[in-house]
Regions:
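Active-site phosphate/pyrophosphate-handling residues
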Residues: 20, 40, 46, 91, ...
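Catalytic donor/gating beta->alpha subdomain of glycosyltransferases that bind UDP-sugars
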Residues: 55-89, 122-166
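Conserved donor nucleotide-binding strand/loop of the catalytic core
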Residues: 1-28, 66, 79-82, 86, ...
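Short aromatic/hydrophobic "clamp" motif used to bind/position activated sugar donors
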Residues: 34
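Glycine/small-residue-rich pyrophosphate-binding loop that anchors the diphosphate of NDP-sugar donors
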Residues: 25, 84, 100-109, 114, ...
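Acidic donor-binding/catalytic loop of UDP-sugar-dependent glycosyltransferases
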Residues: 37-54
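Short acidic donor-binding/metal-coordinating loop in glycosyltransferase active sites
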Residues: 14, 25, 31, 39-41, ...
Length: 166
């Protein structure tokens, strides 16, 4: 951390979950836009620039990036199926966004206007979806930005995928 003196570490000794950490951390944010990613994702070089550009429209309250699955092997059914699912999901988000607004954002990569963030219950599941949907309920759109993408490895096998989801 000494390489980034401008970084602020918000240590919390008790484990309270991701949603509690988001609620707490947002109280320290000073910028007008907040970009969220998962720790296990790799962003494309232009992702941040592209996602911020989408906020030029004042009606946009949230921008959803694209999730991509890196398939390591063609015979890996788990990651292959996951990759197909996310391509389908991305197509739906792109079409919804062109029509009016995407429905929800995936936690791998999305951004919100800071003033639209509302604390969530700490037992919230799918915090990314709930946060983006609340913003849409306030009359803002969720833009989909395929040129801002996050890539993550797929599951090694079906057992690993089941552990992640259950």
């Amino acid at each position: 951390l000494s390489r980034w003196p401008q970084a602020t570490v918000l240590h919390q000794p008790q484990r309270q979950g991701k949603t509690a950490a988001l609620n707490r951390g947002m109280k320290f944010v000073k910028t007008p836009l907040v970009i969220f990613t998962d720790a296990n994702t790799h962003l494309n070089r232009e992702a941040l620039r592209e996602i911020v550009h989408a906020f030029a429209n004042p009606k946009v309250g949230c921008v959803a990036g694209e999730k991509r699955i890196a398939v390591q092997s063609k015979d890996n059914a788990a990651s292959g199926g996951e990759g197909i699912y996310w391509k389908y999901e991305s197509t739906l988000k792109a079409l919804d966004s062109r029509l009016y607004s995407a429905v929800g954002a995936a936690g791998e990569l999305f951004a919100v206007r800071r003033e639209l963030f509302e604390d969530m219950r700490t037992d919230t599941l799918l915090d990314d979806f709930i946060l983006s949907l609340r913003i849409a309920m306030h009359g803002y759109t969720i833009a989909y930005c395929a040129t801002a993408y996050a890539t993550e490895s797929g599951s090694a096998d079906m057992q690993e995928e089941e552990k992640r989801k259950v």
